[in-house]
């Protein structure tokens, strides 16, 4: 028999074969995960996700000569054709914006790293990530996942999908401020009052 993309297509027309492919994509959906929230699902019919015929199946079946159908009943031939899909990108953007992770009340802004005095010395307190989406970048991540037929995507795996802190723990100006603060704590000044001296240090 004739198999195309793992489907037994023996004695089927191109229209019938492509209908099988269409049915295969009818139930498509993608699960979207994000920082700190439960996953949500975007169904294929919400974005007009569908199989798009390229004409490859028809061309493949037309190339087979009538007598090869008889021969094909006794031996298996397997073929692979591309399965192109399409969807409405505007609707995908709308679905993204409707997700819980895109709602302001569910987002926390990132916090900058800063210098703090702890346990007798100055240290850098690292920035926090937050969960505020960068909608443009998040859409690109989601769009690429849908275009490649993935059934799940996690924005947390792509830091660029989120708004990042302006000042990170590796910021050069912050490192310099830390060094200056710790130099201050190590400095000492000695005052002389007649025969008495008093030393003041950063502590």
Kindly give the residue locations of the regions a language model identified:
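Surface-exposed, secretory/extracytoplasmic low-complexity segments enriched in Ser/Thr/Asn/Gly/Pro
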Residues: 1-203
